[in-house]
Amino acid sequence: PYDTATNVGSMQKAITAEEAYLVFGLGPAAAMVSPWTDPAFVYGRPASKGTQISIGENIRVPAAKWKLQADADHQIDQSSTLAATIAALATDPNADKALGILGTEIYDKSTNRAKMHALAFRAFGQLRAYWPDRTSTTFDKQNVRDGHYPLWSYVQYLTPVGTNGKATKAGVQTILDALTGAPVTFTPAFDPIDD
């Protein structure tokens, strides 16, 4: 999953797809969606990153058409760097203006959750906004699993394969088999907890 996030000092709790469409599609200044009106405090990722691609699809703004400041300080390559950038605004009087996107796995680190908070997201056609988790303080991804939270995408794994079409590392092949439903034998054998 992916998050829209702001600084812990912000009073904002949620963002709608319509608001995100305007802020990222028109640009913060032109969108006039308070408090996200200052381009200096709105952060995204490069257009090639899955975070921006997935969120872009959900807000109907293609990743390459986001209106962000065209510099590395606002189109941040790594989610961890983006998290640090937003977290650094803790004592800034403009903390409420901060808005960024990042992977939930980065946001979920306790050091990041202490300095920023995820915004609940209300998708087009929804009546309520949801966090990826059941609440803003849990880590269960309940709303992703039950379909309420749409900001996520599939993950692809790449690995070298031999002429037999199997992964060249046995451990990797075991994981692939387990994920795809192929028969798997674990050594040592284990007893599944959900028989």
Language-model features: locations:
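Flexible loop/hinge segments at secondary-structure junctions
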Residues: P1-D195
